[in-house]
């Protein structure tokens, strides 16, 4: 038993020595010279206040192997905890990173959505205008197209798929329409068995993705297609062309239709 106790007795002073923590004299503490967006916390010696490390920044953790401790990163700020990184490649030296403990989405008094309490705290210290959380969950917002459909082409008889992504709260609902060139748009999929529309949540939080699929395309399918995202706060739309080619590689129709809704 005396060997493990001896090792502990040797290691603990070594850790304290690495930190070089002398006698604490708060009067000698220097105020932070930078803007502290994660709040003020006691330093690793528990004496002076320093700027806390922000979410995603490296930090010093006693759980790391001794050679990798006390690298001068400092402690984490408000609502943050220093944890080992789990995204390192094999063979990389161990590191620790500040992780937010309060991960619930919040709606700020500035009308912006914050992914967690730590992001709202950063904004509050930066703006210094009394920013606070109004309620849990995202703020209401009109849809915004984050990834519009792109022009697609294929030969007669081939298939085409287009996608469209949007964010908003409440979660938007998608509608697809086709402009056949006379200024009028037709909702899809209508009653055409060769046209299908699918939607699902993602890929990001509070985002939705919709797909339009056209099977066995014909010259009549050469047109402009619109994706429209709607919710109670408004709507957003984007368009792209479908070009139908013949087997000589030329376009079957040169209608040049890019009309708005």
From Swiss-Prot:
Keyword Glycoprotein: yes
Span of domain Kazal-like: 70-141
Residue ranges constituting the Ig-like C2-type domain according to the UniProt record: 143-243
Keywords on record: Disulfide bond, Glycoprotein, Immunoglobulin domain, Protease inhibitor, Secreted, Serine protease inhibitor, Signal
IGFBP N-terminal domain mapped to chain residues: 18-101
Keyword match Signal: yes
Compartments where located: Secreted
Taxonomic source organism: Cupiennius salei
Domain of life: Eukaryota
Protein name (database record): Insulin-like growth factor-binding protein-related protein 1
GO CC annotations on file: extracellular region
Annotated InterPro entries: Growth_fac_rcpt_cys_sf, Ig-like_dom, Ig-like_dom_sf, Ig-like_fold, Ig_sub, Ig_sub2, IGFBP-like, IGFBP_rP_mac25
Signal peptide positions (record): 1-17
Site (Reactive bond) location in chain: 102-103
GO molecular function: insulin-like growth factor binding; serine-type endopeptidase inhibitor activity
Residues of this chain annotated as glycosylated in UniProt: 154
GO BP term, pick one: regulation of cell growth
Tissue expression summary: Expressed by the venom gland.
Cystines in this chain: 21-45, 24-47, 29-48, 36-51, 59-82, 76-98, 100-118, 107-139, 164-227
Gene3D superfamilies registered for this protein in UniProt: 3.30.60.30, 4.10.40.20, Immunoglobulins
